[in-house]
Amino acid sequence: MHLKNLSLLNYKNLKTAEFDFDEKINCLVGNNGVGKTNVLDSIYLLSFGKSYFNPITSQNINHDSDFFVVEGEFKKNDKAEKILASAKKGQKKIIKRNNKAYEKVSDHIGFIPTVIISPADRDLIIEGSETRRKFMDGVISQSDQSYLNKLLQYTKLVSQRNSLLKYFAANNTFERDTLEVYNLQMSSLGQDLFEKRKEFLKEFIPIFNKRYADITNNKEIVDINYKSQLFDNSLANLLEENLQKDMALQYTSVGTHKDDLSFEIEGHPIKKFGSQGQQKSFLIALKLAQFDFIKKISKVNPILLLDDIFDKLDENRVAHIVALVATDELGQIFLSDTHAERTEKVVKSSNQSYKIFKL
């Protein structure tokens, strides 16, 4: 699978742009602020139906316009697939496949498997549990539509239960039967999500460990630990046991929406004990493991977006990463950098076809 061409209209700072891509490696070079990252983000948009960097659609429209259109033609299983994403201020975002609009944007997720590696990934280490859950859910969802649907249902139920708890507090009332309806549905869906996450991590963590060892030449031991309240109790019991607490807080304090991943190096949290270089290697291994996992499950090479990959990494390390991906039936890579010569030196060493676009 690869992206053949891309056209942008009023997407972020890019008023109009068109690209015909190489099916192997594509390099976007230019000074900071010219829109390299926004081109990569537009490809991510065509894959996920949303921006990687700013999920608020209206803020991705060029300041001088009230709409954007992003269109790409992909080749998948020897068939042309045209994907279009458009948005207008005050209106619902539209995602189309071959001129037919999806009823739900979520129905498109997984059709164009894509992995992005970006300096913004550091949030996975320094931010709260929600960021890491989103990563885990994103990897699973690209290869399991049923999981995504259950996750969306569960998230909606949590929001509705929270609204009910606020209603109880505001009106000094309590309706156990109504609450039980939410508890039952949440318990079933939450348990399913928990089991799927365990199953996923059992397969994902060895892939991640191998990637980290490849990148660092086996320098240190890293691990990912799944933290969930459901290891100790069923969600049904947890909801019942924490009812008074939830009533006081006016939100749901227990469930799979509180799960987290603990990223560790030599048995300690990498956030506190890992150097910048170790953290960067950890994140890249995480994303390359995502690439490997999706490829294994979907039998399709994901598109790989490398945003500002030279940030905190030297040329040799970047060349090593490109080579790692290139060794095993390369998919399509998009790479952004400020230095054309440095970029060309790295991609030449991969012995793959490439194009360089100067923005």
Swiss-Prot record:
SUPFAM superfamilies attached to this UniProt entry: P-loop containing nucleoside triphosphate hydrolases
Task: Give the source's domain of life in one word.
Answer: Bacteria
Keywords, in A-Z order: ATP-binding, Cytoplasm, DNA damage, DNA repair, DNA replication, DNA-binding, Nucleotide-binding, SOS response
InterPro entries, alphabetically?
Answer: DNA-binding_RecF (IPR001238), DNA-binding_RecF_CS (IPR018078), P-loop_NTPase (IPR027417), RecF/RecN/SMC_N (IPR003395), RecF_2 (IPR042174)
Enumerate the subcellular locations listed in this protein's record, separating them with semicolons. Answer: Cytoplasm
Q: Which Pfam families match?
A: SMC_N
- Which parts of the sequence bind ATP? G30, N31, N32, G33, V34, G35, K36, T37
Matching Gene3D superfamilies, A to Z?
P-loop containing nucleotide triphosphate hydrolases, RecF/RecN/SMC, N-terminal domain
**A GO term from the CC aspect:** cytoplasm
PROSITE patterns recorded for this chain? RECF_1, RECF_2
The UniProt GO MF terms for this protein read: ATP binding; single-stranded DNA binding
One of the GO biological process terms: double-strand break repair
Q: Which NCBIfam families match?
A: recf
Q: What does this protein do?
A: The RecF protein is involved in DNA metabolism; it is required for DNA replication and normal SOS inducibility. RecF binds preferentially to single-stranded, linear DNA. It also seems to bind ATP.
Q: Which family does it belong to?
A: Belongs to the RecF family.
Give the HAMAP family listed for this entry: RecF
The name of this protein is: DNA replication and repair protein RecF
Q: Which organism is it from?
A: Christiangramia forsetii (strain DSM 17595 / CGMCC 1.15422 / KT0803)
